[in-house]
Amino acid sequence: MTDFSPREIVSELDRFIVGQADAKRAVAIALRNRWRRLQLEGSLREEVLPKNILMIGPTGVGKTEIARRLAKLAGAPFLKVEATKFTEVGYVGRDVEQIIRDLVEVAIAQVREKKRKDVQARAQVAAEERVLDALVGPGSGPATRDSFRKKLRAGELNDKEIEIETQAGSGSPMFEIPGMPGAQIGAVSLGDIFGKMGGRTKKRRLTVADSHEILVNEEADKLLDTDQLVQEAIAAVENNGIVFLDEIDKICVRDGRSGGEVSREGVQRDLLPLIEGTTVSTKHGAVKTEHILFIASGAFHIAKPSDLLPELQGRLPIRVELNALSRDDMRRILTEPEASLIKQYVALMKTEGVTLDFSDDAIDALADVAVAVNSTVENIGARRLQTVMERVLDEISFVAPDRHGETFRVDADYVKTNVGDLAKNTDLSRFIL
């Protein structure tokens, strides 16, 4: 768990996301509160529950992007799921407890990666010995091995093909246990029940360079204590886990509607104990969910937050509204973030030896077109910029391989020539932009 201050978290999010200060502050405080709770002693630590967040705002304003960037910052088990993917228990499909099972798998992968680094040096030595066995045979003399070891470390043997034995992948037969639908426990693998069946291996022919990472990871895994790894992962989920529930407005039951709404309300009811705190059984052990932070988000352009079950509303106490994007926001999105759209396209064209030069008035024109189409057709926020950029740079992208060494200047006239008429014609915009 990282110990960034809320100010540091917000400034980190500012590098990639324009505006939405309220949402950034809310997630920054929530993340810091996770760290604060872990500093408490004894029974008080158990009593401090996370304040779950509901982010409300139109599509394309940064809700999902905030969650994505937060995941990288948190250094904690993080899972993003769409609420629409789940069904009520008893219906065909995945039930909400699968969220926690998936989160545990994420945590195990995270902890394993971290622990591999701790045993990296020993794993490198063991992997090197296996490569030497493949090159000169296990019974070769010390002088021969030393000679090949020097060549191996110098990179002279990187392109040489060797045959190595590696762990077979998870190709175990899968089946469902009668009376326990796969939706509830996930498909059961015979490998999970009978272990790895004596550690099945298969022979593969690879270059020395390609085999290096595979062998180092295998040797590192042999040095790890799997039981301890799983226990650490479960503890990380229980104390630091974060779940981002997207599209929560799509499971709202709207007044005067019936039919499929039953299942939607059922999903909300199933989410209640998960968010409030329950114990979920996974194949790795029981997981308590009391201290997992849930961040729900939705556009709520048809439904309202008040259409959620009252109990679910109560379990999402912090409300944050994200604002629709203005023309100025669109302009900033094109230029300010570290991986802004313009920087991406300039870098892509550079691979062809072509220089792209955007004038200030071109950036203004791109923002104007995006705002105009959003206001007349359908407001999809910043995602509209991608459509407009692709349309504007269509010709340049097509001819770039034949124009090596040339410079293309994109100005306001160039933008208007390519998309200006489409933006004005609402009927065409509907289909093209």
Swiss-Prot record:
GO terms for molecular function: ATP binding; ATP hydrolysis activity; peptidase activity; proteasome-activating activity. ATP binds at residues 18, 60-65, 246, 311, 383. It is found in: Cytoplasm. This is ATP-dependent protease ATPase subunit HslU. One of its GO terms (cellular component) is HslUV protease complex. ATPase subunit of a proteasome-like degradation complex; this subunit has chaperone activity. The binding of ATP and its subsequent hydrolysis by HslU are essential for unfolding of protein substrates subsequently hydrolyzed by HslV. HslU recognizes the N-terminal part of its protein substrates and unfolds these before they are guided to HslV for hydrolysis. The keyword Cytoplasm applies. PANTHER family: ATP-DEPENDENT CLP PROTEASE ATP-BINDING SUBUNIT CLPX-LIKE, MITOCHONDRIAL-RELATED (PTHR48102), ATP-DEPENDENT PROTEASE ATPASE SUBUNIT HSLU (PTHR48102:SF3). Gene3D superfamilies: 1.10.8.60, P-loop containing nucleotide triphosphate hydrolases. A double ring-shaped homohexamer of HslV is capped on each side by a ring-shaped HslU homohexamer. The assembly of the HslU/HslV complex is dependent on binding of ATP. Belongs to the ClpX chaperone family. HslU subfamily. Keywords: ATP-binding, Chaperone, Cytoplasm, Nucleotide-binding. The keyword Chaperone applies. InterPro entries: AAA+_ATPase (IPR003593), ATP-dep_Clp_protease_ClpX (IPR050052), ATPase_AAA_core (IPR003959), Clp_ATPase_C (IPR019489), HslU (IPR004491), P-loop_NTPase (IPR027417). GO terms for biological process: protein unfolding; proteolysis involved in protein catabolic process.
